[in-house]
């Protein structure tokens, strides 16, 4: 599906959702994630809230979309977009949220994830960047620890 078509469809759906249920934009983390499945169905999930004892947390929209896909016996994702329900801007999902999409089906390494209304990248490039950042961070930690150990008394 063309870039601007999928983005426009999801944005329109998000705007309608907020008009009907304004409370859904409950925080800056309120989002909608839409996944274009292999059969061209659009499966969406909206951020939700969970409670453990008296502590609340947010369930990511991406996770909710994956659960919806699983419930519909679908696993193959072609495109994925996450929008803020506050200002309808494109939100790049966290790597942990991308990994659940990739884990659903080996072919999802080709899923394109929107990074702006007019641009997307393969899911693997976002995960590779995270892996590289993590490796650099780990190397820096090891260097720092080695330096600290060198000066230990």
Give the role of each language-model region.
Residues 51-67:
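A short, polar/charged loop-to-alpha-helix boundary motif
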Residues 27-38, 124:
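Short beta-strand scaffold segments in enzyme catalytic cores
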Residues 2-24, 72-153:
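C-terminal binding/interaction regions
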